[in-house]
Amino acid sequence: MSSKHFVITVERQYGSGGRLTSERLAKELGIHFYDEEILKMTSETSAIGEQYFRLADEKAGNNLLYRIVTNIKPELSEPAQNGHKITSPENLFRFQSSVIRKLAASENCIIVGRCGNYVLQDQLDNVIRIFVYADTVTRVRRIMDVDKVDEAEALRRMKRIDRTRTEYHRYFTGRNWMDMENYDLPINASRIDYDQMIVLIKDYMRLRGFLE
């Protein structure tokens, strides 16, 4: 591995295999993989109960329609440390973003979801922004396999979770979650497996000078 510092952010459609691929890639690279672990770390840092972060995890705040109409987004300023706004969705997002930035500054790692590509937008020389997607047939099949549900339930979960992630990304970034201009490496996982996705990502890392 090169000595060049890097962070990989991964956004993923539900059922695309993005999370599993990221976890396997982290093991191969010998670096940390952060997904729900960020919730616990943020809770410990902020002294706010983890349940608040879990309830708000990758979900839009209460003013989604207003934000869509006015095209505004919360500022990535320092979070409030006290007062009635301390557990607002915007403030919880600021706490979480602060943890993500600290992780990115201190180690090579993979960060899944939570608008990592947006939170680290000022560090793009050291960030690889990945978006993993796939066709409906592939995703439904993977959801059935991993979640052990029937086809109808898999389709419902896919639509519901994708809608939630889309709204979350729009609410906190003002951006279209699936706008590929916001990513360095979009990956269509419809016709390749997890191992092949890892090969593809590693090849891109070599092109960027992060792997020898």
PLM feature spans:
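ATP-dependent NMP and nucleoside kinases share a basic, alpha-helical "lid"
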Residues: 99-147
